[in-house]
Amino acid sequence: MDRIQITDDLSFSQIIYGMWRLGDDTDTSQSHVQAKVEACLAQGITTMDQADIYGGYTAEALFGETLKAAPALRDQIEIVTKCDIVAPVGRHSGARVKYYDTSAAHITASVEASLRDMNIDVIDCLLIHRPDPLMDAMETGEVLDDLIASGKVRTVGVSNFKPWDFSLLQSAMENELVANQIELSATNHTPFTDGDLAFLQENDIPVMAWSPLGGGSIFDNAAVMNVLNRVAGEAGVEPSAVAVAFLLRHPARIAPVMGTNNISRINALSDALKVKLDRQTWFEIYTAALGREVA
């Protein structure tokens, strides 16, 4: 599997395994979580995407049980996690409202909790999960730089940031923001034309695409499915693999974040790499999603 270079000494797999549903599985045993990770590794999927809030602040600890039981796995993977969303559940059950917190104190406490819960010494990439209207860029930028200097975090990036949010935070930092994780799929295609991907390409910033199947909406779109089914039949893969290949075809260095608890589906995640879309086929999918031909 191809790699996406993040820094001189850090790269991500072209497909990333998303762990946001880890706590929703009917089997949350350590052995089952380990089986998922090993199924990913067998295909060259080495990058694991987490967030402190996933599973109501439980998913990192579930993952940590596997890293504690099988510590050799740590050297085979890259761990991405996120912070700044505070929801009134779990460790934040006393909160009165769901909110964002990019204060130095909260980010530092979140990193310490993530390190402890996942049984690791360093986070490979820490993302600010959502833009915070109350973000003091100087304070947030300084604490992110400090976390890198401390050795607790290797790199930092953002998630769901618009170009202006990204530029604001970057202006207050010494280290480079190395990625932006955004919602992107054939059916959620506005980043192709609203400036989001153009900004990231211009600045050579890798893109992590969450919900690359549109939260399942792709399968409800008859026009899109007609094209996906045809191409899937020709390539001998499932339509979902074609939907992922649609993102991989773009030149913006997009790494789809795929989340499933089904081992057989995990085993098929790399099938997207078998699909090579030419320009016309890509536009067939795109125009089917648009509901009209391009101008």
How should these model regions be labeled?
Residues 131-295:
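Beta/alpha (TIM)-barrel catalytic core signal, keyed to glycine-rich beta->alpha loops juxtaposed to Asp/Glu
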Residues 115-133:
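Active-site groove signature of glycoside hydrolases
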Residues 8-25, 80-98, 127:
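N-terminal small/glycine-rich loop or linker at the start of catalytic domains
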Residues 7-8, 66-75, 115-119, 148, ...:
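Acidic (Asp/Glu)-rich catalytic clusters
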Residues 27-40, 102-118, 164-167, 192-195:
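Short, acidic/polar
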Residues 1-77:
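N-terminal binding-site loop/beta-alpha segment at the start of enzyme catalytic domains
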Residues 28-32, 58, 62, 95-106, ...:
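Alpha-helix N-cap and loop-to-helix initiation/capping positions
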